[in-house]
């Protein structure tokens, strides 16, 4: 039985990555695609490498009142563009919002799939985590759950590829400006700070007061490395053991005793975490790596949709990362 799937926001990087993954999914059948920047084009015009069976699917202008019969809808729209529109979709259509409009909304479940998979199964409205929270929280969750670190005064220093700025980019993100350059942005006010703070508090049962989060754009296409500093008396081995126990049986989180690299996750839904600790200095360093378009966006969205539909969560996501 095929599950009829639609994608809104296919013109952007997140929507395009969702289409790439869904095109090879064993149960999902893409029957609808919408994108403001590519309406009227055949899918093969926008994505020349799309499988032949999808080549003639025409990208439509997004209109929530004119959807075909769907089982699942992936929405990859800019912040502020989806709240009213998605409220018009019938409840029987399962929705995964890859954008940021529903992460705190009533009636929506936060889809941090490797931490709370049981909360996602059977739901019809899932808010996908942001890309930076996906990297940072995957690394922090085991330590917070086991009380190995304090939830207060955590410092997150994160690096992301230029695709993290979106396909629209903007001033300062062109090749000449981003090549051989390192660009900090969103200091003290990044949109992902409240999401990280609230989830730290939820996992720890405490407060995330004093969180510092500074993201940087680096001259690579995709990938996130979050280097996180926290207070705690645990050893490195205790942190690694906690993560291995926490993620036992989880298909997509790899715990490594070597510092992870962004290349390890490229093109996949994998997350890599590692830890180094100095109890004498009351210091724990946690490292989290994801592909910002994979686990940080479309990959986790497909994982969430699998859980919603009662499918194996690995369906359509078992491909190895791209190397080199």
Swiss-Prot record:
Biological process, per Gene Ontology: L-arginine biosynthetic process
Name assigned to this protein: N-acetyl-gamma-glutamyl-phosphate reductase
Lineage: Bacteria, Pseudomonadati, Pseudomonadota, Alphaproteobacteria, Hyphomicrobiales
Catalytic activity, as annotated: N-acetyl-L-glutamate 5-semialdehyde + phosphate + NADP(+) = N-acetyl-L-glutamyl 5-phosphate + NADPH + H(+)
Main location: cytoplasm
GO cellular component, one term: cytoplasm
UniProt xrefs under Pfam families: Semialdhyde_dh (PF01118), Semialdhyde_dhC_1 (PF22698)
SMART domains referenced in this protein's UniProt entry, alphabetically: Semialdhyde_dh (SM00859)
Keyword Lyase carried by entry: no
Gene field: argC
Leader sequence segment: none
